UniProtKB/Swiss-Prot annotation:
<protein>
    <recommendedName>
        <fullName>DNA-directed RNA polymerase subunit alpha</fullName>
        <ecNumber>2.7.7.6</ecNumber>
    </recommendedName>
</protein>
<dbReference type="InterPro" id="IPR011773">
    <property type="entry name" value="DNA-dir_RpoA"/>
</dbReference>
<comment type="function">
    <text>DNA-dependent RNA polymerase catalyzes the transcription of DNA into RNA using the four ribonucleoside triphosphates as substrates.</text>
</comment>
<keyword id="KW-0240">DNA-directed RNA polymerase</keyword>
<dbReference type="Pfam" id="PF01000">
    <property type="entry name" value="RNA_pol_A_bac"/>
</dbReference>
<dbReference type="InterPro" id="IPR011260">
    <property type="entry name" value="RNAP_asu_C"/>
</dbReference>
<dbReference type="GO" id="GO:0046983">
    <property type="term" value="F:protein dimerization activity"/>
</dbReference>
<keyword id="KW-0804">Transcription</keyword>
<dbReference type="GO" id="GO:0003677">
    <property type="term" value="F:DNA binding"/>
</dbReference>
<dbReference type="InterPro" id="IPR036643">
    <property type="entry name" value="RNApol_insert_sf"/>
</dbReference>
<dbReference type="GO" id="GO:0005737">
    <property type="term" value="C:cytoplasm"/>
</dbReference>
<feature type="region of interest" description="Alpha N-terminal domain (alpha-NTD)">
    <location>
        <begin position="1"/>
        <end position="232"/>
    </location>
</feature>
<keyword id="KW-0808">Transferase</keyword>
<feature type="region of interest" description="Alpha C-terminal domain (alpha-CTD)">
    <location>
        <begin position="246"/>
        <end position="332"/>
    </location>
</feature>
<dbReference type="Pfam" id="PF03118">
    <property type="entry name" value="RNA_pol_A_CTD"/>
</dbReference>
<comment type="subunit">
    <text>Homodimer. The RNAP catalytic core consists of 2 alpha, 1 beta, 1 beta' and 1 omega subunit. When a sigma factor is associated with the core the holoenzyme is formed, which can initiate transcription.</text>
</comment>
<dbReference type="InterPro" id="IPR036603">
    <property type="entry name" value="RBP11-like"/>
</dbReference>
């Protein structure tokens, strides 16, 4: 076997542990590749799998989560935590509003949620609340599709007045993956005994099959690595375009900064005609300019800050070709 030829692994075993958990075995892998691929797939599975989650709820008679409701054993914080445990699957849509209405005495579960034809609850036995004889629970919940984790604070309006009273915002974990572990054992091919065997065990919440989750994670990894496969062709193109990739703001004359006449004339006296010329100067260099004092320097720094620029920056390929010729025409 040639040194340059890598072994191509194959799936040798898919062991179904239960409806939500599966163990996948892949071999043979070159030495070290077991941990490389195992860690990459594990991270993608835990952080990048799309899923659905309840992100908002409204409960009749409840204005905020730090309260209780007569006839309901749990406080509102507990109910919101229980709602986060509902495994919802949307078919053909990215958002839906669902309702739940129950009267006690009863144990309210996810199976009591009123579903539409394209919405599925995977764990209908999941407990949401316990109602006594006088208890009643009417709530509306918003379910959306997303990826990763999103804290409630990210979705609360900055202005408190914009937040509707009674809207309870939940932290949302969209990932359908409950647990991922991997281990690397030794594998053998003919006389080679230094190879890896990768064993991945994955458990989901039931909204996606474990083997399907592994396929999606591998596809995501493959898509991300495609950019490196195409790297050679991009390098030459980048070199050709490098000279032209100059921020148009830097090509604007310093007159566009609307400086005082004194400051503008001082800069032009030092052959500083464009914003690109100016930002490459340091404060020390500008203070050496005749008739340009600290007040003018402060003015210059302020107008540059408004444009996201500052003094002392370094630019490649400056000045661009033809700029000085244009400058000569303007000043002639």
């Amino acid at each position: 076997m040639q040194v340059s030829n890598f072994l191509k692994p194959r799936i040798v075993d898919v062991q179904r542990i239960n409806d939500y958990a599966t163990k996948v075995t892949l071999e043979p892998l070159e030495r070290g590749f077991g941990h490389t691929l195992g860690n990459a797939l594990r991270r993608i599975l835990l952080s990048s799998m799309p899923g659905c989650a309840i992100i908002e709820a409204q409960i009749d008679g409840v204005l905020h989560e730090y309260t209780t409701k007569e006839g309901v054993q749990e406080d509102m914080t507990e109910i919101l935590l229980n709602l986060k445990g509902v495994a919802v699957k949307l078919h053909g849509r990215d958002e839906v509003t669902l309702n739940l209405s129950s009267k006690g005495p009863v144990t309210v579960t996810a199976g009591d949620i009123q579903l539409e034809h394209d919405v599925e609850v995977i764990n209908p036995e999941h407990v949401i609340a316990h109602l006594t004889k006088s208890g009643e629970l009417n709530l509306t919940m918003k379910v959306v599709r997303g990826r990763g984790y999103q804290s409630a604070s990210m979705r609360i309006p900055k202005e408190e007045d914009e937040r509707s009273i009674g809207h309870l915002i939940l932290d949302a974990s969209f990932s359908p993956i409950r647990r991922v572990t991997y281990e690397v054992d030794s594998a053998r091919v003919e006389q080679r005994t230094d190879l890896d065997k990768l064993i991945i065990e994955i458990e989901t919440n039931g909204t996606i099959a474990p083997d399907e989750a592994v396929r999606k994670a591998a596809t995501i990894l493959q898509d991300q690595l495609t950019a490196f496969v195409e790297l050679e062709g991009k390098i030459e193109t980048a070199k050709e375009k490098k000279a032209a990739e100059i921020d148009p703001v830097l090509l604007q004359p310093i007159d566009d900064l609307e400086l005082t006449v004194r400051s503008a004339n001082c800069l032009k006296a030092e052959n500083i005609y464009y914003i690109g010329d100016l930002i490459q100067k340091t404060e020390v260099e500008l203070l050496k300019t005749p008739n340009l004092g600290k007040k003018s320097l402060t003015e210059i720094k302020d107008v540059l800050t408004l444009r996201g620029l500052s003094l002392g920056m370094r630019l490649e390929n400056w000045p661009p070709a033809g700029l000085r010729e244009e400058e000569t025409k303007v000043t002639a």
